Amino acid sequence: MTMCCGLWMGCSNDEVYSIVPHFSKIECQPNPVTPGDSITLTARQDQLGKLINATSYDWSFTYSYFYDGAATKDTTVYMPTVKTNYDGISNADPVIGFWVPANIAGNLTVTINAFYSLSAQTSSGQLYGQANRTNQITVNLQ
């Protein structure tokens, strides 16, 4: 008597993809903002990511300010990089605080650059590696 044993393995044609988060907007509180205010900015994700490891967020603030009376100078302030593990630690909306200088002239431009280390390819065929997203708003001052 011959005994046959078969091993059935489940196979799927479904592929595993990394999904890069997408920011819908940056919210500013309080609103309206006046020079000298301490503000909190939140980059809202309308699509969460998936299969992402190391993540870093770089925030910058660009504005003009008064010096020597009426003249203005342009400057950009770069905040320290915020690092996390997106899937392992936190996929929460990125948040940063900033004190608006009392001598600001005009509006404040806020930029967030997010860098993601992908654990799989993306559906568009991008292979493992890094992807990034940039979002920017202008905060109107009163």
Where are these regions (language model features)?
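Bacterial Sec-dependent N-terminal signal peptides
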Residues: 4-33
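Surface-exposed, short loops/turns at beta-strand junctions within beta-sandwich domains
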Residues: 102-108
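A short beta-strand segment in extracellular, disulfide-stabilized domains
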Residues: 35-47
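Beta-sandwich strand segments
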Residues: 119-133
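Surface-exposed, flexible coil segments in extracellular/virion-facing regions
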Residues: 61-98
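Interdomain boundary/hinge segments at the C-termini of tandem beta-sandwich modules
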Residues: 137-141
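Hydrophobic/tyrosine-rich beta-strand signature of extracellular beta-sandwich/beta-rich modules
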Residues: 112-114
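Solvent-exposed loop segments of extracellular immunoglobulin-like
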Residues: 50-58
